[in-house]
């Protein structure tokens, strides 16, 4: 009888783990910022890689937590040069997962993001850090869908819409790079990815 509690203690982590689904994924970003003045901007292709953890439930509704490394930003053209701005974020989405069938799932929710790096690659001034010109914290809404064609493999797409301004406020009359927004600009990202669910 004394062995029973010991066996329960040993088997409990395995039971809990069996009730949790883990997934990994990687893909491409089509990133841009909202309308700005002072320069022409265009969408930029980046990458995303990350994973998620979710309860292994068969219910219609469930929750999912993710962590994603995401390269975003934009291409730009001014009167004097062209280049691209790379904004690297750690995204932490918290999602409601709606399971329509074994093949199709839809996710929606919110996310917070932390800026890890900000750099420019310019024809006029070479490369350099832009970390002081962009906010360290972002937040917004996300929504998308995933298809599970076979086994644990899945493909998906998602739209990320930021609600916070990506750039810091430019000082009145002060110097400011002509390829960094002076007014409120927000990140917009479309993600396409593939992954595996364990």
Please give the residue ranges for each predicted region.
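Bacterial Sec-dependent N-terminal signal peptides
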Residues: 1-25, 194, 198
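Outer-membrane beta-barrel channels and translocator barrels
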Residues: 17, 56-60, 101, 150-152
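Transmembrane beta-strands of outer-membrane beta-barrel proteins
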Residues: 22-26, 63-65, 106-110, 143, ...
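Transmembrane beta-strands of outer-membrane beta-barrel pores
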Residues: 28-32, 69-73, 112-116, 159-165, ...
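Outer-membrane beta-barrel "beta-signal"
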Residues: 29, 146-154, 184-198
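Flexible, solvent-exposed loop segments that connect beta-strands
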Residues: 33-41, 71-88, 116-136, 165-185
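Residue-level signature of outer-membrane beta-barrel architecture
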Residues: 53-55, 98, 114, 147-149, ...
């Amino acid at each position: 009888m004394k062995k029973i509690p010991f066996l329960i203690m040993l088997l409990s982590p395995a039971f809990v783990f069996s009730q949790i689904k883990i997934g990994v994924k990687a893909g491409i970003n089509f990133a841009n910022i909202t309308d700005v003045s002072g320069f022409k901007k265009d969408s930029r292709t980046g990458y995303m890689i990350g994973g998620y953890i979710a309860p292994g439930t068969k219910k219609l509704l469930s929750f999912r937590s993710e962590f994603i490394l995401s390269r975003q930003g934009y291409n730009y053209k001014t009167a004097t040069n062209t280049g691209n701005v790379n904004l690297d974020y750690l995204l932490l989405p918290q999602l409601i997962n709606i399971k329509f069938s074994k093949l199709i799932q839809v996710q929606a929710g919110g996310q917070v993001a932390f800026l890890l790096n900000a750099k420019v690659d310019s024809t006029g001034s070479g490369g350099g850090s832009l970390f002081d010109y962009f906010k360290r914290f972002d937040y917004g809404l996300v929504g998308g869908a995933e298809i599970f064609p076979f086994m644990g493999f899945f493909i998906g797409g998602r739209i990320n819409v930021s609600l916070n301004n990506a750039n810091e406020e430019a000082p009145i009359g002060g110097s400011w790079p002509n390829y960094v927004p002076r007014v409120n600009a927000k990140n917009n990202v479309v993600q396409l990815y593939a992954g595996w669910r364990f």
